[in-house]
Amino acid sequence: MSAARQGVAQARRIVVKVGSSSLTTAAGGLDADRVDALVDVLAKSRSGGEKEIVLVSSGAIAAGLAPLGLRRRPKDLARQQAAASVGQGLLVARYTASCARHGIRVGQVLLTSDDTSRRAHHRNASRTLDKLLAMGALPVVNENDTVATDEIRFGDNDRLAALVAHLVRADLLVLLSDVDGVYDGDPSKPGTSRVAQVHGPQDLAHVEIGSAGRAGVGTGGMVTKIEAARIAAAAGIPVVLTSAVHAADALAGRDTGTYFHPTGKRSADRLLWLQHASTPQGALTLDDGAVRAVVERRKSLLPAGIAAVEGEFTAGDPVELRDSEGRAVARGLVSFDAKEIPQLLGRSTRELARELGPAYEREVVHRDDLVLLQP
């Protein structure tokens, strides 16, 4: 066993993500046998008492299709949310029944992007997951599809899993799919080879990656899984991407699937979301002095350094920070509504406090809520 795979076998806190295609029948409904098989693997891995597992599970929308008379996953958000509302209860009930066979309690955790970005939200989410693990429960995490909007959705549970792995300080992320890892071509065709290890983007430069999920029941394809692996690896978390039928081998550290080596160090949970999974709701154009302050000196963005504002956003939304030539240099959580900023442009905080009141004597984007973007 390689050192990397030995590290996988020795991981104590693990986030496992399973997609809709690994939990459903060909018709799109929940497959009880598949759910039971996955739970059996997770229960065995936990049985020694040394491992903690968080399960990020898709399948709520897929589970709600048949009860609502839908043949395929709808494209519009409203019907997706209706299906999720019906299906989430069915999904958790199935997990609860399956886990009960092993004496394991299930704790449902529904997250939105706010829960990994806003200070109070992500702190509470982290505490809840920590407490569930400490009490021996199996947290089952999903995006809260019924309340998320197009603008603030994670979009797929692969990215959510990467962010949850960072949120709970996991030692390992396992992404389960219906494909045994990354291949250098169509895995259904002869002559293609599995990519056993990925140290960086150069190892995937020759790989053509498809994006479609199976049977129209999910949103995730190989593109989103590789992106999730990249996010987690950049945060210092190793990743194994393999098929659900090889979940036991993956958790045991055997040579299955594709192993992504960590490429970076851990950062604040909110900043990981901000850099990799947020959708900017607007943009602020900075003058040259503000660009240097933000990029080179890692300072907060003050009103005096802003030359222009665009977009419609509210305080707490992610926005893009651009230089005078329109290049994105950073991303941050803004402290003001878009409609408030025009009156602040180019003015000092002292002047604003004197004219508008002390509430305006603050940063537009605080340095703790800001990430630099790679050129």
From Swiss-Prot:
It comes from the Bacteria. Pathway: Amino-acid biosynthesis; L-proline biosynthesis; L-glutamate 5-semialdehyde from L-glutamate: step 1/2. One of its GO terms (biological process) is L-proline biosynthetic process. Its EC number is 2.7.2.11. It catalyses: L-glutamate + ATP = L-glutamyl 5-phosphate + ADP. Residues 281-359 form the PUA domain. Transmembrane segments: none annotated. One of its GO terms (cellular component) is cytosol. Keywords: Amino-acid biosynthesis, ATP-binding, Cytoplasm, Kinase, Nucleotide-binding, Proline biosynthesis, Transferase. SUPFAM superfamilies: Carbamate kinase-like (SSF53633), PUA domain-like (SSF88697). The keyword rRNA-binding does not apply. GO terms for molecular function: ATP binding; glutamate 5-kinase activity; RNA binding. Substrate binds at residues 58, 145, 157. It is an enzyme of class 2 (transferase). It is found in: Cytoplasm. ATP binds at residues 17, 177-178, 219-225. The keyword Endoplasmic reticulum does not apply. Its main location: cytoplasm. Belongs to the glutamate 5-kinase family. Catalyzes the transfer of a phosphate group to glutamate to form L-glutamate 5-phosphate. HAMAP family: ProB. This is Glutamate 5-kinase. It comes from Streptomyces avermitilis (strain ATCC 31267 / DSM 46492 / JCM 5070 / NBRC 14893 / NCIMB 12804 / NRRL 8165 / MA-4680).
